[in-house]
């Protein structure tokens, strides 16, 4: 029996008190800064705005490389266009924007679609090194982060939401000897994620088969996915962002709640 493996369903959540106590006032529902996109890929980052609002966040600001303005225009005052490289991704001068907007946000969502070039990596590295607020990474922002030093990659304000392929790379980077394969059993995955989260500071969220699995500081929760269409990690990550922004001191409970609300809202 594993006392640190907690199980829930949509009908029987682990943390009713948190689910019923969500802020109803937008002013109390948190502010998130979204950073992502490049001139060749930015739709997911722009679409994050509505998904985060639907998940329950109070305010969203999205930072994009400046050339994207020529494509979409100023469709919202919450879209901010930052200095870019010639190839249309964030450059080193973007750091001032990153830091300025982080100061008024409760956390950062690195949404992905970040060009895998050295200048973008350096500016993201400098941002992460200066920020103690929650940072949620998904999609190819995880791949970019794998180039960081271990002391930046492995911090207690870092939350990774991704598939098992990305987690295997993360485990390898942080010198875990456990292997993750696509056909791993649920019980083995729980064991591996529990061990990893005991030894490391980060929190993890993934979907495997019919379950959302959350791991943080040695605790693991599994949430049964009640419908096939809810195997949607893109929707899930936005609920993770919302819950972490609103409950930064109780990451495990917050992320476990996100596994409920992304299926019901």
Regions found by a protein language model. Give the residues of each.
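Short glycine/threonine-rich catalytic loop with a Thr-x-Gly-x-Asp
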Residues: 21-24, 41, 219-244
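Short glycine/serine/threonine-rich phosphate/pyrophosphate-binding segments
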Residues: 40-54, 117-120, 144-145, 233-237
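N-terminal low-complexity/intrinsically disordered extensions
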Residues: 3-11, 186-190, 250-264
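Substrate-binding N-lobe of the ribokinase-like
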Residues: 18-82, 260
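Conserved post-catalytic alpha-helical subdomain immediately downstream of the catalytic base
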Residues: 229, 233-265
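Glycine-rich phosphate/dinucleotide-binding loop and adjoining beta-alpha-beta core of small-molecule
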Residues: 5-6, 63-223
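Glycine-rich phosphate/diphosphate-binding loops and the adjacent beta-loop-alpha structural elements
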Residues: 34, 111-114, 176, 180, ...
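Positively charged, low-complexity intrinsically disordered leader regions
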Residues: 1-26
């Amino acid at each position: 029996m594993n006392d640190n493996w907690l199980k829930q369903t949509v009908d029987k959540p682990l943390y009713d008190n948190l689910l019923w106590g969500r802020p109803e006032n937008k002013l109390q529902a948190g502010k998130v800064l979204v950073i992502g996109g490049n001139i060749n890929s930015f739709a997911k980052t722009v679409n994050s705005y509505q998904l985060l609002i639907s998940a329950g966040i109070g305010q969203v600001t999205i930072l994009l490389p400046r050339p994207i303005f020529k494509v979409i225009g100023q469709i919202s005052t919450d879209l901010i266009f930052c200095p870019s490289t010639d190839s249309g991704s964030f450059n080193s001068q973007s750091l001032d924007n990153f830091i300025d907007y982080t100061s008024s946000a409760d956390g950062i969502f690195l949404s992905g679609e970040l060009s895998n070039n050295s200048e973008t990596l350096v500016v993201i590295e400098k941002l992460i090194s200066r920020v103690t607020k929650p940072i949620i990474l998904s999609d190819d922002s995880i791949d970019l982060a794998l180039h960081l030093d271990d002391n930046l990659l492995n911090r207690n304000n870092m939350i990774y939401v991704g598939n098992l392929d990305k987690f295997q790379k993360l485990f390898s980077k942080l010198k875990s000897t456990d292997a993750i394969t696509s056909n791993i059993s649920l019980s083995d995955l729980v064991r591996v994620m529990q061990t990893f989260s005991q030894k490391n500071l980060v929190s993890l969220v993934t979907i495997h088969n019919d379950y959302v699995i959350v791991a943080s500081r040695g605790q693991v929760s599994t949430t049964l996915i009640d419908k096939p269409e809810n195997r949607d990690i893109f929707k899930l990550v936005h609920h993770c962002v919302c819950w972490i922004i609103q409950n930064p001191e109780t990451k495990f409970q917050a992320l476990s709640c996100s596994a409920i609300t992304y299926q019901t809202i």
